[in-house]
């Protein structure tokens, strides 16, 4: 009789431990990469003013697919293809080919970043804005 009670007690304890441990699992939340954008003024060969944009992911390592840029009048510029390049957290990367730039327009520019997190391959699409002021 004592052996049966011992086995029942151990069985109940084991079952309770399994139920409690399965209920305590943390729910994983996928962190969406956050980007900041900066701009540098450039002068084109014809003397007109332009901008070169640079982005960086401030909270994750990423594999970038493309960046779609919208100028202040909400015109979509052809997407900048990042060719699946990997960037580590806080690594700055150009949002145009090295010898090109964008016509300078005052106002708020919008940047839609698309790619994958390198840690788990989860795809993302997130936006950042930059306000361009001055002459």
Range-by-range predicted roles:
Residues 3-5, 16-43:
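Bacterial Sec-dependent N-terminal signal peptides
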Residues 12-13, 111:
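Generic signature of intrinsically disordered, low-complexity, basic-rich segments
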